[in-house]
Amino acid sequence: MNNLRPTSRRLKSIVTGGAGALGNSIISALLQRGDQVACLDLNPAQRSDVPHFHVNVADGASVRAAFEQATCALDGLDVLIHAAGVMRTSPFLDLDEIEFEELLAVNLLGAFRVAQTASKLMLENGGRIVLVTSIHGQIGVHGRCAYAASKGGVASMARVMAAELSHSRIRVNVLAPGAVDGGMLPDPNARQGWVKATPSNRVAYLEEVAGVATMLTSEGASFVNGQVIAVDGGVSTVRRFEEPVAPK
């Protein structure tokens, strides 16, 4: 069996957070592959070449309604790439419960609602799910306590999903980007900090992250399941330091 063969049919794909920079790039990559794509987002559509459906991932009824509309438009569902989420910065000692719960409601519970809804629609024919998290769920960064907890929780959930859904031919993986260009790093100081911390000496391009998301839903990744794939230039596994130079 050749697992590197191209996809034999047009896949029917849903991208949540598709109006954002990364989600929009993922949609472009899926369309280039030949997929039929629907965009789900809380914000207005950014493009007219795919159907767009309003969704609030913090509301279960909204998620179910959006998926019903999208799967009706696509006439089925093969692929879910969940890229919806929010990020806020607050030092641990200043973080209050309301802010923490708000991030969990969107990032963790939102991912649960979306993934469970999609999984139920995939039970008969199988499917491929990619949940977009962040390397913040794997490393400690100042001010990201609630965000890191929410994203780390999604990764743990995905592993259990992979274990439970494999018998239904549903693969579940996690994509954990590091710092990404394309309008996602408006603070030049923050951007430079990530560049300095990254062994690759730069941040990721949107297309690089979208390419990995697309790969994880391809036939070539048919034996990849329950994994967290970091797209971060090595920052989560390689620590940069300047080796002292001995005086001459």
Model-derived regions: residue spans:
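Active-site helix of classical SDR
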Residues: 115, 150, 158
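Alpha-helical segment proximal to the catalytic Tyr-Lys
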Residues: 120, 163-167, 222
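Residue(s) in the substrate-gating loop at a strand-loop-helix junction
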Residues: 134
